[in-house]
Amino acid sequence: MEKLADLNYTLGVITLLNDTLHNILEEPGMVYFPYVASALTVLFTMHKASLPAMKLAMRTSQCSYRIIKRVVVTLINTLLRLGGYNDYLTDKDETEKQINRVVKELRQQLTMIEKLTTREIEQVELLKRIYDMMVVRHDREIDMSKETNQKAFNTLHDWGNDRNYDDNTDVIAPL
């Protein structure tokens, strides 16, 4: 494990890769060299980056399984993104977090809907009561004799049929 962080070991691996690539290039039918070189570079970089991180994580963490799972998922997601895919892997914990978040939002929306329907029902009941109070009821006569002084006013029967309502009467006032 100490070889992983050693500079000579790293240079030896790079030299081995270069020799391998030069041997492959000598063959006349090799046209995929840039793709092979890119893939080997990515794999080597991931190898150099992930092993020391995993070594450190195994020493310091008690839950090494979760760390390894998280590192593997991250590496696979990196490879998928480098390959041009928009899909990605999620571990079970992340999926459960997303499900819990969605369920929480649904519960909040349901409580809001319940509150709104309760308010709407109360408003409809209030409008019904207001309508009932405003409806004119024709079943009972309102006695207006106490409201105005009926002695000072002539009724239609008092005017009689021979007199026109538009006829003026002479008013004489003292000067």
Curated annotation (Swiss-Prot):
It holds the Pfam family Rota_NSP4. The N-glycosyl content is primarily Man(9)GlcNAc, with a small amount of Man(8)GlcNAc. This is Non-structural glycoprotein 4. It comes from Rotavirus A (isolate RVA/Mouse/Brazil/EHP/1981/G16P[20]). SUPFAM superfamilies: Rotavirus nonstructural proteins (SSF58030). Plays an essential role in the virus replication cycle by acting as a viroporin. Creates a pore in the host endoplasmic reticulum and as a consequence releases Ca(2+) in the cytoplasm of infected cell. In turn, high levels of cytoplasmic calcium trigger membrane trafficking and transport of viral ER-associated proteins to viroplasms, sites of viral genome replication and immature particle assembly. Ca(2+) binds at E120, Q123. It comes from the Viruses.
